[in-house]
Amino acid sequence: MLADLFTAVRLLTVVPLGRTEGGRALRFFPAVGWMFGGLWLGIAWLAREAGLAEGTGALLTGAIAVVASGMLSGLMHWDGLADCADGIGVRGDAARRLEVLRSSTVGAFGVTAIVFVALLQVVAFSVILESGVWWGLAAAPVLGRAGATLAAGLREPARRDGLGARYSVRMSVSEILVATLPVLPLLGWRPESHTALTVATALGLLLAFVVPGPFVRRFGGVTGDVLGATIILTETAVLVAAAVVGGPL
């Protein structure tokens, strides 16, 4: 079990723990999300202490936080988002789209997706920082990685030789419930935040089921890029939801 946790850390971050093999590691993806949530909460706290939690300071902090999260992941998830955007944008069948995913170049669709989603994250982070809805900074990364767990555990891989196949292991309902246990500490936030947090959490889990669907239909299954895109898109949606629904710290 510990080896699978280390493998999940190695896969989702630049921290050199564990091995590069091991399909059961996907059940620990939400737990690894707390590393990113802790990073964002730490940056938010430092920004508040430095007087950068309002106005342009909050926007600057949001940009720093998004870049820091990307660096911790080695930008792999963002690469997956770009590849999936390019794959969806290209004309052709599933085989042609999978060729695009394998390409090392980023096209117009990929660049547009990265810029648009990154801007959404920066703005949402800054709004959360100013309003004090800090639970969103923890919820978004955890639920984003839970989305990847659900995508890999409930859907078939697009090909047998890719990252999606390596980490996609069919999971039972009980295994999925256990895998999402790291989400529960979020519910221990201050009681007055529960309504807003419940809304954002429910949205995040719903999107975790929904987001991979269009990719799976177009690519014929789950790939490593699909998992990365699912993480980023679910994470962003929860950030935006937290910024919109609000609630005290």
Regions found by a protein language model. Give the residues of each.
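Hydrophobic alpha-helical transmembrane segments
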Residues: 1-74, 78, 82, 88-90, ...
